[in-house]
Amino acid sequence: VQHALAVAGRFGLPVVPQGARSGLSGAANAIEGGLVVSTEKMTAVLEVDPGNRLVVTQPGIFNADLSRHVEQYGLFYPPDPSSWEFCSIGGNIATNSGGLCCVKYGVTSDYVLGLEVVLASGEVMRTGRRTVKGVAGYDLTRLFVGSEGTLGVITEATLALRPAAARPHTAAALFGSARDAADTVAAVVAAGLVPSLLEIMDSTTLRAASDYLRADLPEDCAALLLWQSDLGADAGRAEIAALGEVAAAHRGEVMIADDPAEAELLMSARRSVLVAL
């Protein structure tokens, strides 16, 4: 990567970094006369440090693969875009991806501790830290997060991890109007409830997911609100029920997914939206 950028800089060639090419905005599209630098083969997990709850990884690894790798240490990486099975960590960092769990756990920038980046000159820069607290100097790491490859090519990332959460409880509510579903979300926040997942799917999305999965998903509603709680057995059920009460107060038809297969179907529907549409 260093050599490629140094040569491109010498000859004035534009450089486009590419990860898994799963983004929809065209940020990784090639430019005529330019040089594409692909990181898709840079998939190694270089280190997992359970004591400091961090992982050091190359940028080409898929989000889901990294998540599964750290699970064996009793840890998890919260940012989980719906495309997590086929989007890369480098792309997540470059676009500051969120995910289905961002309502509780935040977005990618909240977990990037440090980066190794190759600049346009071919120079390698290391930013950030390996500690929870790091307040000295300019926060160059956050400058690169979300920069979509315009400032350099990410070649290594140090990411914060969390202790593995409990198996989530899942529920959903059907609404006759998207406005009622949106008002429910606002009411959930106002009530101080913090589910581990809170997602809306409108009727168009539900039909697309149903066709794609060949599944019997609800299609006679204007919107479906999906939520989860990872607080554990009793606390999780209580939080699920509390959100259900809020949804019912806004004319939602609440469904508690006690069957793991039903819960998995709802989650698969949400994760399939990108390709289904």
Regions found by a protein language model. Give the residues of each.
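Noncatalytic alpha-helical scaffold of FAD-dependent oxidoreductases
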Residues: V1-L277
